[in-house]
Amino acid sequence: MAGVGIRSYACHRQTRRLLDGDVLMSPGPGNTDMPQTKSSPIAHPYPGRLITLDGIDGVGKSSQIEILAERLRSEGRNVLCVRDPGSTDLGTKLRAMLLDSDLEMHRRTEAMLFMASRCEMIESTLRSALADGVTVISDRFLLANVVYQSVGGEVDAQTLWQLGRLACGGVQPDVTLLLDLPAEISMQRVGGEADRMESRGVDYMAKVRQAFLDELPNAGGRTHVIDASGTIEEVAETIAAIELF
């Protein structure tokens, strides 16, 4: 699979240090010494698994979530797919507001609406699913909230992490898969369908991409950066090589 693969956030030496700092080795085809990060030994106290996919717009999260869910179900796992924001009545309404290109709001306002949507999703759906042993795959989670609302400087990332942990009530991802793509390619893929955040332009998206890489170590659980520039099938093969359980 030329040009497609997993790389560690550790390649970005300018990023902040790990929380709790340990680096795990996760061997795979052609990646026998591939670093894998873990910023917290316990993601949540439940038997289920929370896997999140994230990245800038246009990286192909939706396609990869569908493929991953189908593969895990074929292995006999009970899988629930959610999206953040969304997946509840309140979340769906908040999502429409947050992505409305005609609606302007302060970054703190954005941050609080995202937090409210995530809190509702956790308390109405995720917590009980994880307690029942379900594998939950989430399209975005707290990492995206921190990244998008901190870029621009109106709200600092540390404050957002603190607020986010409170809103999540002890639930954080077991595994975060960050699909990475240059901002220029992202904007080409999005095309003329840009929402309110995407419409801020390629320079903004480049800052968002770097912020994802910088903040990834703080996401909790194990984290992987995946090259999303290949075909859907190539990226899916890369994800399939990762140990998720």
From Swiss-Prot:
GO terms for cellular component: cytoplasm; cytosol. It catalyses: dTMP + ATP = dTDP + ADP. It comes from Rhodopirellula baltica (strain DSM 10527 / NCIMB 13988 / SH1). ATP binds at residues 55-62. InterPro entries: P-loop_NTPase, Thymidylate_kin-like_dom, Thymidylate_kinase. Phosphorylation of dTMP to form dTDP in both de novo and salvage pathways of dTTP synthesis. HAMAP family: Thymidylate_kinase. PANTHER family: THYMIDYLATE KINASE, UMP-CMP KINASE 2, MITOCHONDRIAL. One of its GO terms (molecular function) is ATP binding. The keyword Transferase applies. Belongs to the thymidylate kinase family. Keywords: ATP-binding, Kinase, Nucleotide biosynthesis, Nucleotide-binding, Transferase. One of its GO terms (biological process) is dUDP biosynthetic process. It is an enzyme of class 2 (transferase). Its EC number is 2.7.4.9. The keyword Transferase applies. Gene3D superfamilies: P-loop containing nucleotide triphosphate hydrolases. This is Thymidylate kinase.
